[in-house]
């Protein structure tokens, strides 16, 4: 996989997890 794609995917997962955590609390 492309390095840029990996970085974007990681950032996307981070943002989603952060949003889910904030909603849970």
UniProtKB/Swiss-Prot annotation:
Induction: By chemostress caused by the herbicide 2,4-dichlorophenoxypropionic acid and its metabolites.
E.C. code: 1.13.11.-
Sorted UniProt keywords: Aromatic hydrocarbons catabolism, Dioxygenase, Iron, Metal-binding, Oxidoreductase
Cofactor detail note: Binds 1 Fe(3+) ion per subunit.
Cofactor list: Fe(3+)
Catalytic reaction list: 3,5-dichlorocatechol + O2 = (2E,4E)-2,4-dichloromuconate + 2 H(+)
EC primary class: oxidoreductase
Gene Ontology MF terms in the entry: dioxygenase activity; metal ion binding
Source domain of life: Bacteria
Pathway: Xenobiotic degradation; 2-(2,4-dichlorophenoxy)propanoate degradation
Biological processes annotated in GO: catabolic process
Keyword Manganese carried by entry: no
UniProt similarity note: Belongs to the intradiol ring-cleavage dioxygenase family.
Name by which UniProt lists this protein: Chlorocatechol 1,2-dioxygenase 1
Organism: Delftia acidovorans
Underlying gene: tfdC
